[in-house]
A protein has these predicted regions:
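A short, structured surface patch at a secondary-structure boundary
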Residues: 4-100, 106-113
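Extracytoplasmic substrate-binding proteins
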Residues: 84, 95-97, 105-196
């Protein structure tokens, strides 16, 4: 279950993960988005998630990216140049025809409160995996989502080890920062119209 980040008592989406050979055996009473795992032809829409798939050794299971101009990960850029990963347009202006031809088994998208922007993608009949990790209030909570993404590719063990490494490094850096004499401010993400996002 993915909770709605804007209405904490509501679900944004429920996913029912099943192996391809068991998909037909699931009772119809189970309500939620059915996703056959492991994913083999996914579409990613953020550089952060592309990088995570690289760390999980799953880039061969990426069929396309949205927002290509923001993705600067050498292995993925190389696969795009080789034609192994397609550029399917922008997140809010995807090339629907290209997505139909690609036949993805899932679309990884960031949810937004005004979700009407994905209405055409709903018509594809492809599961949309809402990546609400960016809404987490702490860095470690956001990083822990890598374990969720690991479920979709049957690499939970590797995802768990990656999270443990990130957690260890984060705690070490936090302890070091608390001991520093000067307090610096750090801005991440990007500046848009005078506001950092």
């Amino acid at each position: 279950d993915v909770k709605n980040p804007w209405k904490s008592k509501e679900l944004l989406q429920r996913y029912i993960l099943c192996t391809r050979d068991n998909a037909q055996k699931l009772p119809s009473s189970l309500q939620g988005t059915r996703v056959s795992i492991p994913l083999e032809r996914c579409v990613m829409s953020t550089a952060a998630h592309c990088y995570l798939l690289d760390q999980l050794k799953q880039t061969t299971n990426m069929a396309a990216v949205l927002g290509r101009k923001y993705i600067h990960i050498p292995v993925i850029e190389n696969e795009i140049k080789r034609g192994k990963i397609a550029d399917a347009g922008e997140e809010f202006q995807p090339n629907i025809e290209k997505l139909i031809l690609i036949k993805p088994d899932a679309l990884f998208l960031s949810p937004y409160e005004q979700a009407g922007s994905y209405q055409n993608l709903d018509k594809l009949g492809v599961p949309i995996i809402f990546c609400a990790d960016y809404m987490e209030s702490s860095s470690l909570a956001r990083a822990e989502w890598m374990k969720v993404y690991g479920l979709f590719f049957n690499c939970e063990e590797l995802a768990g080890k990656l999270f443990e490494e990130v957690e260890r490094n984060y705690k070490a850096q936090t302890a070091m920062a608390h001991q520093a004499n000067s307090k610096n401010e750090i801005f991440t993400e990007r500046l848009m119209s005078g506001t950092w996002y």
